[in-house]
UniProtKB/Swiss-Prot annotation:
<dbReference type="GO" id="GO:0006098">
    <property type="term" value="P:pentose-phosphate shunt"/>
</dbReference>
<dbReference type="GO" id="GO:0005975">
    <property type="term" value="P:carbohydrate metabolic process"/>
</dbReference>
<protein>
    <recommendedName>
        <fullName>Probable transaldolase</fullName>
        <ecNumber>2.2.1.2</ecNumber>
    </recommendedName>
</protein>
<dbReference type="GO" id="GO:0016832">
    <property type="term" value="F:aldehyde-lyase activity"/>
</dbReference>
<dbReference type="GO" id="GO:0005737">
    <property type="term" value="C:cytoplasm"/>
</dbReference>
<comment type="pathway">
    <text>Carbohydrate degradation; pentose phosphate pathway; D-glyceraldehyde 3-phosphate and beta-D-fructose 6-phosphate from D-ribose 5-phosphate and D-xylulose 5-phosphate (non-oxidative stage): step 2/3.</text>
</comment>
<keyword id="KW-0704">Schiff base</keyword>
<dbReference type="InterPro" id="IPR022999">
    <property type="entry name" value="Transaldolase_3B"/>
</dbReference>
<feature type="active site" description="Schiff-base intermediate with substrate">
    <location>
        <position position="83"/>
    </location>
</feature>
<dbReference type="InterPro" id="IPR013785">
    <property type="entry name" value="Aldolase_TIM"/>
</dbReference>
<keyword id="KW-0808">Transferase</keyword>
<dbReference type="InterPro" id="IPR004731">
    <property type="entry name" value="Transaldolase_3B/F6P_aldolase"/>
</dbReference>
<dbReference type="InterPro" id="IPR033919">
    <property type="entry name" value="TSA/FSA_arc/bac"/>
</dbReference>
<dbReference type="GO" id="GO:0004801">
    <property type="term" value="F:transaldolase activity"/>
</dbReference>
<dbReference type="InterPro" id="IPR001585">
    <property type="entry name" value="TAL/FSA"/>
</dbReference>
<comment type="similarity">
    <text>Belongs to the transaldolase family. Type 3B subfamily.</text>
</comment>
<keyword id="KW-0963">Cytoplasm</keyword>
Amino acid sequence: MKFFVDTADVKEIRELNDLGLVDGVTTNPSLILKSGRDIIEVTKEICNIVKGPVSAEVAATEYEQMMKEAAVIARIADNICIKLPVTLDGLKACKALTSEGHKVNMTLCFSANQALLAAKAGATFISPFIGRLDDTGINGMELIAEIRTIYDNYDFRTEILAASVRTVNHVKEAALIGADVVTAPPATLKALVKHPLTDKGLETFLADWAKTGQKIA
């Protein structure tokens, strides 16, 4: 499984990348707003830090404007992945862009039907939103499972990018189902390493080691 970090915070991205935990980055208009920076400027900086795909989203809803904005975004760096909403215009733009060799991340996916159409349009990634579905009382993981089955049935190459991930359990469940990628906020990715028994065991080992009076280096 690949880990993408869902943020436009360059400091956080750099820290996680230095740990070897980042395979890519996802951003959206809300995260750009939170960063307080120009979208082109911050996206270019992120692309220079991370070797993997960096998703940057168009802010248009109609095909022609989507294509214009996508052209600007695509020029930022070679590892750019253009992010489009799963709409009819978005699907049309996806088909056109992937035909030109661009990577495309279809976002705001809330149904298996949407994921099927995205794969037909040649999307590189499909981003089903787990947490937002959970908020409506629907189990978001069931959607991941449905998409996995459909993609496996027809050998689609579109990768399932589990998004709107809020907890470490979301990550575990997505991995068990077979999502190709999880994108999560920095805090969630860092929390994956945490376990109270690890902390307790380390404390015991260090205390016992101190009693030996030895040094390794």
